Amino acid sequence: MNTSPKGGTEILHEQLLSRLQPEDLEGVNLIRSICHPDLIKKDQINIVWQHLSYDQPNAQLMHDRRFVDQVDYFVYVSHWSFNRFREKFAIPEYKSFVLKNATPTFTNIVKKDSKEKLKLIYTSTPWRGLSVLLLATEYLNKHRDDFEVHVYSSTDIYGEAFKKAEGSNYDGLFERCKNTKNMVFHGYATNDEIRKAVSESHLYVYPSIFEETSCLSVIEAMSAGCHVVTTNYGALPETCGEFATMIEFEPNLKKLAERFCYALDGVLTKYRAKGYEQDLTLQMNYYKQYYSWDTRINEWRNFLHYVRRKKES
């Protein structure tokens, strides 16, 4: 078994392939996000499964119509992403589809009694909002002591070369997390370990400063019964629906941290008063129905059947 660190795209790709039959992908070249002519196979149906945001370097070849014309279909993981690519690159809509992300259904979800310290969790990369969360935690520590923020964050998921080149940029941030009251820094963890941690957590706290195209970590958290507190940046409103506490994005990170702290203070109080119980039941049922692989795999099979049939006609 491959135990090397994996990011969300790698996890989703692995989960998809494990649920498809060989015949589902017969004659299909499924390209993960990177837009480059070297990845095109002329004798196959070329599908770009696009997880990247429209502004990422590896997506910029979408400006090249020669590349776009060689791709048979583009699959986007949210309607937000589809529309951003449509606006920036004038993508051909007739070969564009939206198939949202998914996660395996959670079982044996156990939350500790909320009379103890509430367990908050952050599971994203450090540059997507950890510095804001750290500052918000420092602010919140001045007002209350009934919570604990567990941080699962590292540069490991992008490989050893990236870690060597960029990892030291975040050592100071990680050290501050380790030395901040009511923060517990875990660093890197496998997806299985992350899933166990979110199933035991009460709140998922993500003051995102990155335009997510979907956000697998949020899908996992909401499926596991965490109330999510995040920003309304990128595709997060689409991913979270009406279940999360949404903070209006603010480019001034100090002001964003203050805003996030204020919102989180209210959420903690409401959670202790059992104000989210009904919502969380609805939320878990919703994500089990609409964001589980039990549902999504049928959409993928239908899509792959469609593209193979079109090729034959």
Question: In which residue ranges do the predicted regions lie?
Answer:
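N-terminal pre-catalytic "stem/leader" segment of glycosyltransferase-like enzymes
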Residues: 1-35
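A charged, aromatic-enriched C-terminal amphipathic alpha-helix characteristic of glycosyltransferases
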Residues: 7-11, 251, 255, 272-312
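Conserved donor-binding/catalytic core segment of Leloir-type glycosyltransferases
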Residues: 112-129, 134-137, 141, 150
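Nucleotide-activated donor-binding/catalytic signature segment of Leloir-type glycosyltransferases, i.e.
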Residues: 163-192
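Short alpha-helical donor nucleotide-sugar binding micro-motif in glycosyltransferases
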Residues: 188, 196-201
